[in-house]
């Protein structure tokens, strides 16, 4: 059991829950980061901290959560849960303040009832068809354990420091909504992002896992990593992160660490009295 790193120069809040994951294996990513302390908080409690007051002790927020989806809904699964006015106001204020954010993998599906959340992250994974940016969009696609090559497209960016130009990955990929015009691309996947290569998320909700029969989707973006401004915050999204194969990948660990260090360096400094002495 890791101890509490009160004196770590970078304090990070890591929001989790909403999608299955191996907590111990995921936490090991952060235990290997020198000078970074990660405090893991489950949703829905994590949402109570996502405001300027709640995030005062932290230099960065990592999103590995998937809030706002009710998988026990009796119809139209998953149901969409409204985040509430208090969360919307607090999270918006956090972005206005400029707190750095790193969003990973399934975080792209979070808070589907709040369009501004997708705008902040730079995209949306849709579990069922619905409106997005004024257009009706199909449900998104997923494909587990895809062996592919990831390609760095912004080698000079600090998040790409020490990352090889090309590196192998084996992870889940999404055929989802990426707002490419609003982001700075960092990573692309060499893979065919077409409906035939993915499974329907809505079919999975109907009990038909790994099925795309009758499902159609436009050809999608191969973008799997980007940075953007969300209000005054610097945000990095990394699409990989489905399970232990990726958690243990040293290149992935370097990506996550680089992203945390970069967004923390771009965040407003904490008050001196909030640091451990």
Stretches with model-predicted labels:
Residues 3, 24, 28, 33-36, ...:
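Catalytic beta-strand/loop cores that center a nucleophilic Ser/Cys/Thr
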Residues 41, 186-188, 238:
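Hydrophobic residues at beta-strand termini and immediately following loops
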Residues 27-30, 75-78, 116-119, 200-201, ...:
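Short, glycine/charged-enriched secondary-structure capping and boundary segments
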Residues 19-20, 67-68, 108-110, 165, ...:
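Short, solvent-exposed loop/turn segments at secondary-structure junctions
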Residues 2-9, 204-277:
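Extracellular ligand-binding/catalytic regions of CAZymes and related secreted enzymes
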Residues 68-162:
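A glycine-rich, often tryptophan-bearing local segment used as a flexible ligand/cofactor-contacting loop or short
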Residues 9-15, 23-103, 107-111:
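Helical hinge/lid and interdomain linker segments adjacent to catalytic or ligand-binding clefts
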